[in-house]
């Protein structure tokens, strides 16, 4: 049915269990925006001050780079990272994301630390490209999904993945 699905999101703001179905071909593009960081800070009921904002930004940016780094081993590995991150962060805030959490996730994935170190420099360039593409699309809200069909494109702003998957499943049945 679909030729491509691009999903822009921010870590700690989404539920990633839906993406592990392998039914639809998703390209996950993390972005870090000031609004998303503010939303994360508010969702976790953290102090509303500049110091906390900067700390949340730092942790979200670090986790995003770590996800991008692991994703160089393949999209499936990247999705497994997101699911492991969700599991590790239950009952915690983004401020709790530290190297110990990363090491635990890499261990769960049987991901070689030397491969992580080797790919890390490329993650920053990949994140910059993802951010640029997000802004080129003229979008301002997260999450946002672009579904590129054979003859059409659909933009879905600020909907939970469960609703997007329901829509895609209905479209697949119609075809």
Language-model features, listed with the residues they occupy:
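C-terminal cap of thioredoxin/glutaredoxin-like
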Residues: 3-23, 99-175
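Structural alpha/beta surface segment adjacent to cysteine/selenocysteine redox centers
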Residues: 15-93
């Amino acid at each position: 049915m679909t030729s491509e699905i691009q999903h822009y999101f921010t870590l700690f703001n989404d539920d990633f269990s839906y993406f592990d179905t392998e039914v639809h071909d998703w390209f996950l593009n993390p972005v870090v925006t000031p609004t998303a960081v503010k939303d994360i800070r508010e969702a976790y009921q953290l102090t509303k001050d500049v110091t906390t904002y900067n700390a949340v930004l730092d942790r979200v940016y670090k986790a995003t780079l770590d996800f991008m780094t692991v994703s160089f081993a393949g999209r499936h590995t990247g999705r497994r990272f997101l699911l492991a991150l969700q599991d590790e962060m239950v009952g915690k805030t983004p401020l709790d994301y530290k190297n110990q959490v990363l090491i635990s996730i890499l261990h769960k994935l049987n991901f070689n630390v030397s491969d992580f170190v080797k790919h890390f420099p490329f993650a920053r360039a990949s994140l910059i490209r993802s951010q640029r593409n997000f802004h080129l699309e003229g979008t301002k809200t997260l999450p946002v999904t672009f579904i590129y069909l054979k003859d059409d494109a659909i933009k879905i702003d600020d909907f939970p993945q469960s609703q997007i998957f329901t829509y895609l499943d209905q479209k697949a049945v119609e075809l």
